[in-house]
């Protein structure tokens, strides 16, 4: 039986004393975006200098002061990560008019600068395209030249590694890594540097104000990153947990997780995970398996037979690295204490995908 633990702290992540140095395999997070108006009050509560700079109309100083609030958290992220561990940070730039001056505030560049100062190695990032059909999406002078502005419809997923490349030396670690593989057809989409197929969050968080405060990113985004940059039973940290999306994705992926959230009002939202995570994870995993089967069927029509079979499911796969791939359903969740969830995961494949496949699928 695969078991995972998921701990949530409602504290400031600038001091993550409960997390040991070098104990985390992966960080997946999305901080409050500096210079986005909805976050002004939150940043100002932590530093009166920010409110003063806003009142004065000093955009550049406000930008730097807001990032100074985030800097200690990135320092903590670097501390708790293992050598070879990854940090994936979803961040959007901001556009804003202050004191009559419209400009871009490049949040991704400021975080990149801090990460490099800490000693992280920067890896190729992902552009997440968030298209909007809002009628007022065009900024500036509309159709007239020398006064209109490019529409900002993308965010960044910055990817960093601490130290040298991770190695899987022990036999059990190698086995877990093989079982944690992703499908070839997923790899071509997931490891692309532009994501066009991940839609914005549609989570039902109870009320509009809660959704705004959380700035939740979609489950699919966190799930992909966790499966791309960690193995089963690894520890995933989110220092800006919000509504618990990263925790939910870790639960669905057979990883352990730690989350920090400074807003106590979100505790009730995160607590609801125990009511929905088992059923929703099973559905998501089955949709993932079904997409692979559909890929197999379509490829057989155009390219012919496959060379390899998955050992657990029996369906064809493109590469030998997918032969031991296994998706573990969460089957039971308990909450032994406030802020702690424990999950038992199935170690056998989903029965409906372990049938006798037609000869045209399995004949090599």
Can you describe what each PLM-predicted range is?
Residues 1-139, 148, 183-364:
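S-adenosyl-L-methionine-dependent nucleic acid methyltransferase catalytic domains
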């Amino acid at each position: 039986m695969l078991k995972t633990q998921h701990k949530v702290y409602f504290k400031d992540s600038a001091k993550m004393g409960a997390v040991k140095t070098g104990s985390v395999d992966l960080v997946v997070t999305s901080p409050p975006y500096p210079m986005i108006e909805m976050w002004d009050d939150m940043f100002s509560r932590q530093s009166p200098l920010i409110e003063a700079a806003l009142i004065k109309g000093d955009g550049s100083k406000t930008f730097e002061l807001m990032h100074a609030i985030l800097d200690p958290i990135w320092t903590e992220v670097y501390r708790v990560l293992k050598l070879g561990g990854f940090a994936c940070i979803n961040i959007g730039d901001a556009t804003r008019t202050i004191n009559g001056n419209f400009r871009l505030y490049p949040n991704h560049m400021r975080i990149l600068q801090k990460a490099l100062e800490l000693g992280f190695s920067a890896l190729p990032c992902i552009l997440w395209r968030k298209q909007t059909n809002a009628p007022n999406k065009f900024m500036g002078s509309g159709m007239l030249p020398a006064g209109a502005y490019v529409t900002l419809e993308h965010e960044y997923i910055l990817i960093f590694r601490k130290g040298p490349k991770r190695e899987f030396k022990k036999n059990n670690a190698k086995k877990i890594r093989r079982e944690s593989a992703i499908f070839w057809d997923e790899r071509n989409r997931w490891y692309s540097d532009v994501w066009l197929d991940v839609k914005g969050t549609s989570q039902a968080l109870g009320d509009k104000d809660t959704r705004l405060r959380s700035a939740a990113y979609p489950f699919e985004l966190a799930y992909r990153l966790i499966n791309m940059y960690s193995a089963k039973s690894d520890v995933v940290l989110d220092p800006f947990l919000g509504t618990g999306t990263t925790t939910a994705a870790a639960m669905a992926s057979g990883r352990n997780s730690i989350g920090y959230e400074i807003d106590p009002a979100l505790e009730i939202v995160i607590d609801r995970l125990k009511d929905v995570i088992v059923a929703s994870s099973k559905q998501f995993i089955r949709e993932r398996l079904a997409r692979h089967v559909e890929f197999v069927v379509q490829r057989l029509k155009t390219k012919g037979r496959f060379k390899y079979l998955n050992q657990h499911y029996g369906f064809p796969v493109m590469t030998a690295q997918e032969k031991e791939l296994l998706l573990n359903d969460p089957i039971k969740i308990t909450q032994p204490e406030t802020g702690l969830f424990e999950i038992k995961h199935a170690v056998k494949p989903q029965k409906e995908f372990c049938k006798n496949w037609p000869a045209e699928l399995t004949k090599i």
